[in-house]
From Swiss-Prot:
This is Phosphate import ATP-binding protein PstB. CDD domains: ABC_PstB_phosphate_transporter (cd03260). It is a peripheral membrane protein. The complex is composed of two ATP-binding proteins (PstB), two transmembrane proteins (PstC and PstA) and a solute-binding protein (PstS). GO terms for cellular component: plasma membrane. Belongs to the ABC transporter superfamily. Phosphate importer (TC 3.A.1.7) family. It catalyses: phosphate(out) + ATP + H2O = ADP + 2 phosphate(in) + H(+). Residues 31-272 form the ABC transporter domain. InterPro entries: AAA+_ATPase, ABC_transporter-like_ATP-bd, ABC_transporter-like_CS, P-loop_NTPase, PstB-like. One of its GO terms (molecular function) is ATP hydrolysis activity. It is found in: Cell inner membrane. Its EC number is 7.3.2.1. Its main location: membrane.
Length: 277
């Protein structure tokens, strides 16, 4: 089902920059989903989804609005627990341990699996206090330890040089793109293993989006990253693997280059060529 790259508006030069020869079956698995269904009351939102998220790669979820991609993302750190009437059937194994097992420490899970949302949500505190927020919750208050964590996390989020002289000013004075990178710094300060990014660039301008995309590329050397995006160009640029979802079902999952240039399923081809969605 080979496609002319121009037919679906995806810049094929974006593909292949860091993804040569990737084989999903050969990857170390970070998150295993062996048949997951999810319900909101009587309404089923996910239907028997099975997939393996590879360690220290970027996996993108794409699909039309309402297809279940954000719902699936939020199962990875149990954010859906906060929704009344939400029920999960099946398991999600984080490095072999079922995060839905009885007695799971959900607060610790959310430290290990951090999340960044569509709209930057810095706290109405200083830049410094935003970054150390999670550390203080853990009881870490030594100034030297916090100072080092702030510098390390802000450098990791490619923000240090822009804010190092204003750490004790309000985070609300930062631009939208800076705020989103600050939120990423706050998330990585507690040293998670996985980063979940739910359309992290949808509220940002193109230049800020580019900075966040470059940051994602850098962060995958330390973290497993899963990103939900409506922007197929973005999925092509930043991800190693892509999952296409439709109406709560996983239609196709594979390396990004192949999925965009030679999809196995007609439904995937129709979506990326703009026939629907």
């Amino acid at each position: 089902m080979q496609q002319d790259s121009h037919t679906h508006g995806i810049d094929m030069s974006a593909l292949g920059r860091n993804k040569q020869g990737l084989q999903l079956a050969e990857e170390t698995v970070a998150i295993e989903v062996p048949g997951l269904s999810l319900f909101y009351g009587d309404k089923q939102a996910l239907f028997d989804v099975s997939m393996n998220i590879p360690k220290q790669r970027v996996t993108a979820f794409i699909g039309p609005s309402g297809c279940g991609k954000s719902t699936l993302l939020r199962t990875f750190n149990r954010m859906n627990d906060l929704v009344d009437g939400c029920r999960v059937e099946g398991a999600i194994n984080l490095y072999g341990n079922n995060i839905y097992r009885k007695g799971e420490d959900v607060a610790e899970l959310r430290r290990r699996v951090g999340m960044v949302f569509q709209k930057p949500n810095p706290f109405p505190k200083t830049i410094y206090e935003n970054v150390v927020y999670g550390l203080r919750i853990q009881g870490i208050n030594k100034k030297r330890v916090l100072d080092e964590a702030v510098e390390w996390a802000l450098k990791g989020a490619a923000l240090w040089d822009e804010v190092k002289d204003r750490l004790h000013e309000s985070a609300l004075g930062l631009s939208g793109g800076q705020q989103q990178r600050l939120v990423i710094a706050r998330t990585i300060a507690v040293e998670p293993e996985v980063l979940l990014l739910d359309e992290p660039c949808s509220a940002l301008d193109p230049i800020s989006t580019l900075k966040v995309e470059e940051l994602i590329y850098e962060l995958k050397s330390k973290y497993t990253i899963v990103i939900v995006t409506h922007n197929m160009q973005q999925a092509a640029r930043v991800s190693d693997y892509t999952a296409f979802m439709y109406l709560g079902k996983l239609v196709e999952f594979g390396d990004t280059d192949t999925l965009f240039t030679n999809p196995a399923k007609k439904q995937t081809e129709d979506y990326i060529t703009g026939r629907y969605g």
